[in-house]
């Protein structure tokens, strides 16, 4: 019998027998007997249903319930269908797992945000109707965030380095040397010029008036023997009023022989009187700002003495000639372990258009370095005449 299970099925025994007679094919006897004994099921896929071919014994009593059971059995999925569905499900599961794993991969783009949050932001903007250049804005914001984080990290590292160095130096200078050892400590801050003005304490040790008088006498002595001064101004040298020339300006300063630094001197707070002006931290220390030279030779000697050596063990220093004007015979300030050059500068006015300018050094006696005459000529030009210069002097 040929029947379409989806659309039609025989409802009684008589219709089944008549249908079998009409559709009975003419075949050999052996083949016909075999098909009467064993029903044959052959499934073919079509667009609207499944065509089922089955044979039923002519004398068999088949009820409607049994026929419907046969139809339902034939419509059940075959092994091929089950296998195909299993493969499709496994492939779909693998694809979903790969997609989920890719979502959780942390790359440089999602350094501060997760892909899930970024996807929600994009969906929200699209739903609201906004369509900006999301990719460019994200890249710029991420780049700015990374740059800000690097700069912040760099500042933290440098702050830690400088803070550690400052803490070590301050701890050694203040806590160890001043508080523990009860000694004076010097903390250098920045380099300073070797030339500086005399402090109030230094001026107390130098007789400025004596230097001023001696320098004026030495200048007048040299000018009186100069040919140009004899011819144009005469001897003895007088000013425009016919009196002895007077000093219009005189100043002094000092020059260290070694490089100098400006720093802080700290001592224990012993409340003793001192000629310096101190700032006090009660019960801790007192401090002031001062200038100090850096003696390279003295530093080397100190390092060698700490390891049990002396300078003479490594090299021999031959002292230069004791020539007047060298640092060997310069003016040492009391309480200082280094020598200083004491320089002076003065001006003497001869008339309205002539001015004598000189400078030199002082050590027990005055030593002039240079004497110049500044004169305004009739054509209005200001000309400098070098009247005296000590070529052997050290400036």
UniProtKB/Swiss-Prot annotation:
Subcellular location: Mitochondrion membrane
Keywords attached to this entry: Membrane, Mitochondrion, Transit peptide, Transmembrane, Transmembrane helix
Highest taxon of source: Eukaryota
Residues spanning the membrane: 156-176
Membrane topology term: Single-pass membrane protein
GO cellular component, one term: mitochondrial membrane
Similarity comment: Belongs to the AIM39 family.
Protein known as: Altered inheritance of mitochondria protein 39, mitochondrial
Organism of provenance: Saccharomyces cerevisiae (strain AWRI1631) (Baker's yeast)
Gene it is expressed from: AIM39
